[in-house]
Amino acid sequence: MLILQPTLDMAETWSKDRLAPMVRDTAVLTDLVADAKARDSGNTVLHKRFTGGHVTVAGANSPTSLASRPIRVVLADEVDRYPQSAGAEGDPISLAQKRSDTFFNSVHVTTSTPTIKGVSRVEAEFDLTDQRRWFCACPHCKEYQTLKWEQVSWDKDEDGKHLPETARLICSECNKDISDKQREVMVRQGEWRATAPFEGKRGYHLNGLCSLFPPRKGYKTR
């Protein structure tokens, strides 16, 4: 597996702060992956070997880190922060995915928080998929809907000051208030639904209103 981060520095930080603690705290992984500091482990911060496979963490700005060994699974993370080219070698996502050309069962995953509409990499990738969204049923009218930030409403005091602690979700169909506890139940009981024809690629969109943690003290609009 190749996990591609925006830069090589970010790849090292992600490996130390996210990957290493996960391996350390998950018993089945601890037994499989030797610590990079262990003598003769063969592992480094950016490359972990284990029985049956390996994980390489690379930077999209480093053509060298995108070269060498073949990879079956390519996970490109935070692609909207990638440079347009890995040095002079071209698009880093294409370079990474070419490493899986020899596998009939290759898997490509592209993820990111979207940035600017119209120039976002992940938006362009999502538009090529069946565009699955998380649909939830209103606790009042039972109509399924996707949760949007436009559905968040709040009160103002007599001076026009916003009162964030009064923020609540409004059903897009019946316009009734939905409490945060009701929202959590909605999200837990929701389902993925494709909103475009399937042409070989699955895509998933999920925003912060579907998050189940941390507990909210009002909503922050974005």
Q: Where are the model-predicted features located?
A:
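Phosphate/NTP-binding elements of NTP-utilizing enzymes
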Residues: 1-222
